[in-house]
Every structure is written in C-alpha cells, then in structure tokens.
C-alpha cells in the first residue's frame, strides 16, 4: 500500500506540474546544454546531465520528470522500509511528501531541488538496506555517488555532505564523534572533486 500511495503522489505531481517550472537560471542551464557549453555560473554537471536526458523528453520535461521520479522514489523507499514496523506510519510518509512546503517545490526546476531529491534517495536507500548485509555495500556505493553528485550540482551545500556520508558509512551504528572527525577530510576531498570535474573533466568557463 505505501508504494502505491507514492505512485499516486507521482501521478498527481505529473498532473499538477508537468512540464515543470523553469526560471531564468534553469533556462540558462538548458540553453547551455543545447549549445554544449559548460559554464560555472551554474553547475556544469547539471548542464551535462540535461544534455544527456533531454532527448527522452525535450525541454523542461526531462529534468522535471527526473526530479519528480527521484523525489517519489525516495519517499517510496522510506515508506516501504517503515512498513516492516508500522503500516500506519508507512502510509503517513507519502502524505508528508504532499505537504505544501515540500510538494510545491517538486515542480520547480532548480538545482537545489534536484540535489535534495538525490540526497533523499541516498539516505532512504541506506536506511532500507542497513540491516541487509548482502545488499548494504551496493546501497552504500550508490548513496555515496548520489551524495557526491548532489555536491557537484550544488557545491555550496558541501558542508552538509559529511553528515550524510557518515550515515551512509555507518547506518547501523551512526556516531557523531566519527562523523565530526570525517568533516574536514570529506570536505577537502569534495572540494578537490568539484574542481577536477568542473575544470578538469568538463573544462568549465
């Protein structure tokens, strides 16, 4: 039932917000994607992503669909995991996703929303498999990639990333002490990663 409610939420998102809302910044990124120009005023990684997915649904629709799918996937994973403990609590999760402070942003094509959706999936994935050792390593790897991707989308959110990395590494025994020890090295690695990807791989201007 909870995943079904999430699917209904996704359908409602499409009905209300399709094709998505583009502001000036998003339009700028989309036009750069069409030209194959990677500037660092916005995220060149988002520009590349949009260029890759645009043939699936040209225009704002491709990015809107990706954001909406990630948003509802994250809540569906969380709901399905909580259903093992409480069906009522699990059913409440998709309803939380529909509350105005969250839901009204799903249709807005902002890199902040894309980053948040990626991080939501990352945390929900690790939480879903934290007690399943067989799948936990794969869940960790995917989560860490999503966290790094979120930083590449929104570099000034880098300070929040070590907390998420800490949970991804130690979901069953999260420790503030270990996570705080991770802050400086994680941020240094992420700063270097951003520079290597932006200016080394994509030659952003």
Predicted regions mapped to residue ranges:
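Multi-pass, polyprenyl lipid-linked donor-dependent membrane glycosyltransferases
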Residues: 24-27, 63-70, 94-126, 149-160
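Specific aromatic-rich, kink-prone transmembrane helix
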Residues: 77, 115-132, 142-143, 147, ...
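Membrane-interface alpha helices of multi-pass inner-membrane proteins
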Residues: 139-154, 165, 186-191
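Short hydrophobic alpha-helices at membrane interfaces in multi-pass membrane enzymes
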Residues: 87-90, 130-148, 177-182
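Juxtamembrane membrane-water interface segments immediately following transmembrane helices
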Residues: 178-205
């Amino acid at each position: 039932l909870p995943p079904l409610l999430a699917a209904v939420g996704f359908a409602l998102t499409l009905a209300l917000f399709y094709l998505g809302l583009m502001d000036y910044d998003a339009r700028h990124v989309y036009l750069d994607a069409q030209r194959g120009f990677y500037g660092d005023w916005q995220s060149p990684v988002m520009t590349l992503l949009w260029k890759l997915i645009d043939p699936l649904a040209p225009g704002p629709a491709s990015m809107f669909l990706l954001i909406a799918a990630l948003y509802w996937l994250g809540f569906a994973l969380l709901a399905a995991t909580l259903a093992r403990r409480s069906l009522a609590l699990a059913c409440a999760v998709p309803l939380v996703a529909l509350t105005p402070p969250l839901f009204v942003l799903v249709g807005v094509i902002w890199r902040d929303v894309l980053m948040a959706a990626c991080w939501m999936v990352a945390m929900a994935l690790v939480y879903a498999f934290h007690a399943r050792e067989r799948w936990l390593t794969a869940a960790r790897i995917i989560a860490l990639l999503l966290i790094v991707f979120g930083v590449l989308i929104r570099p000034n959110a880098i300070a929040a990333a070590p907390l998420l990395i800490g949970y991804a590494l130690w979901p069953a025994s999260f420790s503030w002490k270990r996570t705080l020890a991770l802050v400086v090295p994680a941020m240094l690695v992420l700063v270097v990663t951003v520079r290597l990807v932006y200016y080394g791989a994509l030659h952003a201007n």
